[in-house]
């Protein structure tokens, strides 16, 4: 219970004071003169020049007023001076009107410790639970406040923005990997065919790589290698002919489609023009003596892969800007990055250490597709720089390693002919050799019989020669029949090709940046709460007593307030701030619909 002086002068019983002793709200002043003028302007219900207060023993201080109770019904506040305190003004709440008799009413009161000692206390650094803070930075971006409020925000989001980002817009790459070189070199005939071509492709490796840029409609970009136009074949021709070429059939290890091959290429989407480094790539014509030429690109070497950056624009773009900046934070707003292939990550937009959301793309030419998408400067501390920031972004990455394979047809006849080519040639040679030897042997025998004048011997020898030749023909026919039987076996898919047709046919390429926001009803509910009570900050600091135009809410824990006042009143003031109180800077107390911008 606050200390009450024994007496008072210039006692004024007031009406229309819009706050009470629950200390949920109070009027905050910048000077004692402003404070006096504000209270003195309120309606005076009754005045007394000098009063001795009563009820101290019962801890129920009151003033005996010579007025009927019903004439005091609107009395809510008292102000008075005390000579013993240098004529200081004291302020008090009317707590009860007690009927004494027809002409006398006891007006019970208790000291308003906050108004009475407002200019006698000093805030020290204290633990601030919540208060009104600065909402927006000077550049219009929200200030960061992510402390959990423990409030219900629902279980569903509205999707407010969907953007698809691809490394090279509509262009993609068919990657063909072979065990050996499938093309010749201009001026060198076919001297390189079937050569093993060990090279640098991120690391030393023995396989050969061909790339073929194309679009969904089957067309190819105008491609230059150095200053030379590569005149690439349409993608359908490429696929049709590559399995017809003797240098390609069963030489192919894998084929897949990818959005990014690990290099920042000079590509102009508007002109559909691609420029490649002649030291890394060369035009390749794959052909044989029976089929037309297929023009594609052979990868000579790739010493190092490069990171491609996609600037998606303002990281806050797409979100509905709310009056309360905290509603732009996670979990009220979420940025999701997904490829719709089972790979996704949820981002806290505020932790992107940049005003723009930039996607870093990493890729390679491996035996299968692998492309990584990471967010630049996500959770990157201010102490990181350069390559460290780039590396740190890998901690939050979406890695698309879906095979994206193209079906490979295995022709049993081609496989048999090529895989057993030497064996077949040996069999043919053996058949012919045995037939000739047999015929020669028969001829020698016939000659001997002729010398010996044995007509029967001559006849048998001729028969033997005929039989030997016939056996050779039969053996050749059997071998050809075996080959014909194999040719009648239907071609089979040795690799089905995964979901490439579904993913690319439906346009699921690159990554999608999806922005989600709370349902409108929850945004309204939380916005009104934050507007009234500010944000949790859980920090040790001096409170913001007057940073807003209309009001400041402050709640502390074990706050530290000093002042040249009695300890009982000081402790009560500390309790008021620990419980939370709204300090009003305007006379429109209780009207939370007013604009409450920063001063």
Curated annotation (Swiss-Prot):
Superkingdom, taxonomy of origin: Viruses
Localization, UniProt: Virion
Subunit field text: Homohexamer; forms a hexameric tube structure with six flexible hydrophobic loops.
Main location: virion
Keywords: Late protein, Pore-mediated penetration of viral genome into host cell, Viral genome ejection through host cell envelope, Viral penetration into host cytoplasm, Viral short tail ejection system, Viral tail protein, Viral tail tube protein, Virion, Virus entry into host cell
UniProt keyword Membrane present: no
Entry GO CC: virus tail, tube
Functional description taken from the UniProt entry: Distal (knob) tail protein that plugs the end of the tube before DNA ejection and forms a channel perforating the host membrane during ejection.
Protein name: Tail knob protein gp9
UniProt record similarity statement: Belongs to the picovirinae distal tube protein family.
GO biological process terms, semicolon-separated: symbiont genome ejection through host cell envelope, short tail mechanism; symbiont genome entry into host cell via pore formation in plasma membrane
Annotated Pfam families: Caud_tail_N, phi29_gp9_C
